[in-house]
């Protein structure tokens, strides 16, 4: 994650503060002097998620006088934890850093979790390319209870006051002397060196991992020791004089009892305990132990793992024998070789080369040990935390092949004419406020909520595609019923895949154009064009690879799911992916448009989202009409079997005929058009349309995002019992009439739900 995203998050924090405080003029001035971009966060919930402030937000709501802004929450957090320390942030007190996902920043982990070690290029920590383990990072970060801003200080303990470095009495002159001697070894000081008298801030990497809390023991020397070992080559290490080799161990003269006491006294193990234990191990693994630190030299495979201060003492953290295995690279996807191969394959698709997983430079004496000595404790990043993952966005690993450009006036005019029939028309408020947000009702978590009438056709089409992903693809195929109870992350992922399928299908499965709002005006409306505040702000992103499209939508899904223009953005993306020229060729009448009176969706728009072509009819193939004078009119219908089906009340009234390409789709999901409204009907049986025997008695589920539905509606369809068509239609729910256009004369049991009339 680059600095631009960090800057945008910070700007969003300021905008939220100004907005919540009612500083409207200041907000306007800020938007003028610093316009928003695609990376701007315009939703307060999204801002809390990015900064991981959910825990603080819940705590704040429970208070008698809750704060109103995220900036105040962060400020109060730091004041509560660090505002009362001695001298109020003196030179020895590190300044906390937010745990915001960014490059070269790691999420703190707990010792009880699975051991993970990330290896990457240590030659330049600020420019090193790091492997992204986004899903693992997210799962691990969600387990951080209480310390949401970086796990600095346990919420159940008062913060420690900053103390000077603890040393063994009488050893201070030796420490100072050793430090000065080692400082002379290099003419150019390393980036990690922080001299005892300097007033500089510690590195943010150390702060984020909680190393600034509690009594800090010999941290400057330890930092230099790590950097020193990193810069030392094998040849220089082997030929180093015995006198110089003793200078490094002299830095670690803090008492082990002090370190272990701070670890044992805490009820829960903190990162300080991990640091202390590993620091003790450093003392043991030193090539030559000083006289005042008696320890026997460990074999190479023992040096690759942390050990206890004594062989007979149990591990401080209660780790099992598994935890004492030789330290290797543990990644969710397998070992380092497998991970590197996957990265190489991914980068080969992108036409670039990945940064290799770093091979450790071993001392000559260690090379004979093979794999057991492949990773030494000194080779881990300078924070020495074993359980850590790198959280960074996908673009940092895979550079997407995306061509982006701002929309111009001519394109905006074409789109408006295609949508409304005139460039003077605009989207109404129902469209502007509609996005693809999911229901919070426990039994309807799969459902997309509709705020008002208007874009129901778009919502129903997207709902059908989301159900396709939830029920019949991926891991959900084994248990369709479980697919109706998705997690928030899973349903968002299915929404991403559904949107990707829609725009990719509209682009002929060769290209896709994704329209995103930038919050900045891209052109000045002139002439025969009426601005609506939406089209003028668009940035158009073209992609020619489906995998890149999914990744891009995953990064931008908040604009579609949270909004406010999610429904509009998808509609425009489908239009631009298909192109305005081809859509006009799809129409029976070239002057047709996609949005009708009162903002209702036309059949052409629904067909565009379901099949990728904006044809005007629902029958199969093409019908030729001969007027008798030699002129033949072509009426275009559905060209192939659709993934999602369609049923219409108009067919019951003999006003249209729905062909089998829509009546019998690949998946048992149907968009239902009834009374100028679109809703969804689906089955949990994937074989419903493949085996006629399953169509004797089966269940269908009905969902209407606009009906304020509070419970699941399950209909039982019985085709063995026929219902007379002469029944008074005024008393028959229109939904039953739509169902009988597919299953003639079938009886419909609402199973206790109130029939929708």
Curated annotation (Swiss-Prot):
Its EC number is 3.4.19.12. Keywords: Hydrolase, Phosphoprotein, Protease, Thiol protease, Ubl conjugation pathway. Residues 232-242 have a biased composition (Low complexity). Residues 190-201, 299-310 have a biased composition (Basic and acidic residues). The keyword ATP-binding does not apply. Residues 254-277 have a biased composition (Polar residues). The keyword Phosphoprotein applies. One of its GO terms (molecular function) is cysteine-type deubiquitinase activity. Pfam families: MINDY-3_4_CD. The modification Phosphoserine is found at residues 219, 223, 289. Residues 152-173, 190-334 are annotated as: Disordered. SMART domains: DUF4205. It catalyses: Thiol-dependent hydrolysis of ester, thioester, amide, peptide and isopeptide bonds formed by the C-terminal Gly of ubiquitin (a 76-residue protein attached to proteins as an intracellular targeting signal). It is an enzyme of class 3 (hydrolase). The active site is at 456 (nucleophile), 677 (proton acceptor). One of its GO terms (biological process) is protein K48-linked deubiquitination. Belongs to the MINDY deubiquitinase family. FAM188 subfamily. Probable hydrolase that can remove 'Lys-48'-linked conjugated ubiquitin from proteins. PANTHER family: UBIQUITIN CARBOXYL-TERMINAL HYDROLASE MINDY-4-RELATED. This is Probable ubiquitin carboxyl-terminal hydrolase MINDY-4. It comes from Homo sapiens.
């Amino acid at each position: 994650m680059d600095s631009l995203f960090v800057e945008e998050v910070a700007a969003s924090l300021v905008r939220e503060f100004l907005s919540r405080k009612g500083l409207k003029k200041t907000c306007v001035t800020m938007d003028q002097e610093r316009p928003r971009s695609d990376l701007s966060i315009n939703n307060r919930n999204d801002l809390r998620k990015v900064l991981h402030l959910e825990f603080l937000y819940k705590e704040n709501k429970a208070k008698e006088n809750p704060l109103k802004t995220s900036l105040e929450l962060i400020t109060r957090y730091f004041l509560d934890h660090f505002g009362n320390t001695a001298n109020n942030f003196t030179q020895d007190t590190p300044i906390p850093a937010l745990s915001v996902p960014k490059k070269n920043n790691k999420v703190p982990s707990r010792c009880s979790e699975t051991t993970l070690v990330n290896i990457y290029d240590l030659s330049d920590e600020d420019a090193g390319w790091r492997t992204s383990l986004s899903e693992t990072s997210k799962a691990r970060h969600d387990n951080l209870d209480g310390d949401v801003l970086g796990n600095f200080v346990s919420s159940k303990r008062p913060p420690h006051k900053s103390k000077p470095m603890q040393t063994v009495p009488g050893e201070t002159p030796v420490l100072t002397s050793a430090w000065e001697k080692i400082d002379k070894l290099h003419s150019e000081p390393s980036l990690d060196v922080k001299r005892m008298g300097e007033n500089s801030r510690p590195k943010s990497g150390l702060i984020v991992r909680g190393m600034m809390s509690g009594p800090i023991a010999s941290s400057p020397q330890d930092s230099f020791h790590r950097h020193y070992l990193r810069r030392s080559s094998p040849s220089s290490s082997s030929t180093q004089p015995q006198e110089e080799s003793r200078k490094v161990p002299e830095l670690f003269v803090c008492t082990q009892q002090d370190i272990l006491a701070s670890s044992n006294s805490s009820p829960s193990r903190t990162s300080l305990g991990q640091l202390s234990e590993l620091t003790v191990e450093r003392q043991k693994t030193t090539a030559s132990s000083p006289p005042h630190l008696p320890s026997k030299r460990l074999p190479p495979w023992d040096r690759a793992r942390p050990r206890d201060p004594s062989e007979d003492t149990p591990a401080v953290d209660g780790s099992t024998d598994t935890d004492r295995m030789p330290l290797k690279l543990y990644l969710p996807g397998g070992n380092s070789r497998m991970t590197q191969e996957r990265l190489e394959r991914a980068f080969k698709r992108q036409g670039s080369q990945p940064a290799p997983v770093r091979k450790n430079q071993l001392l000559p004496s260690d090379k004979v040990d093979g794999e057991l000595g492949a990773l030494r404790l000194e080779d881990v990043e300078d924070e020495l935390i074993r359980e850590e993952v790198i959280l960074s966005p996908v673009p940092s690993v895979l550079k997407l092949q995306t061509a982006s450009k701002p929309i111009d006036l001519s394109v905006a005019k074409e789109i408006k004419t295609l949508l409304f029939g005139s460039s003077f028309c605009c989207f109404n408020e129902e469209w502007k406020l509609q996005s693809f947000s999911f229901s919070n009702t426990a039994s309807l978590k799969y459902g997309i909520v509709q705020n008002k009438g208007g874009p129901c056709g778009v919502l129903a089409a997207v709902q059908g595609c989301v159900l396709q992903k939830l029920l019949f693809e991926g891991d959900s195929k084994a248990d369709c019923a479980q697919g109706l109870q998705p997690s928030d992350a899973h349903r968002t992922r299915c929404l991403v895949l559904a949107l990707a399928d829609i725009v990719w299908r509209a682009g002929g499965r060769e290209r896709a154009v994704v329209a995103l709002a930038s919050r900045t005006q891209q052109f000045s409306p002139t002439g025969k064009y009426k601005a609506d505040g939406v089209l003028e702000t668009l940035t158009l992103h073209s992609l020619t690879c489906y995998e890149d499209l999914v990744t891009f939508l995953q990064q931008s899904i908040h604009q579609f799911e949270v909004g406010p223009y999610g429904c509009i953005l998808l509609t425009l993306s489908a239009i631009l992916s298909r192109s305005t020229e081809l859509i006009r060729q799809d129409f029976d009448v070239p002057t047709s448009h996609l949005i009708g009176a009162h903002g209702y969706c036309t059949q052409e728009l629904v067909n565009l989202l379901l099949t990728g072509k904006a044809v005007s009819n629902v029958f199969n193939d093409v019908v030729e009409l001969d007027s008798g004078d030699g002129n033949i009119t072509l009426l275009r219908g559905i060209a192939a079997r659709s993934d999602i089906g369609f049923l219409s009340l108009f067919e019951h009234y003999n006003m249209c005929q729905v062909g089998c390409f829509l009546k019998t789709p690949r998946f048992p999901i149907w968009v239902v058009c009834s009374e100028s409204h679109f809703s969804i009907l689906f089955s949990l049986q994937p074989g419903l349309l493949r085996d006629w025997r399953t169509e004797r008695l089966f269940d269908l589920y009905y969902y209407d995002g606009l009906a304020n539905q509070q419970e699941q509606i399950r209909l039982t369809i019985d085709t063995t019992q026929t219902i007379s068509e002469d029944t008074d239609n005024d008393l028959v729910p229109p939904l039953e009439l739509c169902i009988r256009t597919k299953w003639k004369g079938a009886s419909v049991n609402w199973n206790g739900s109130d029939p929708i009339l």
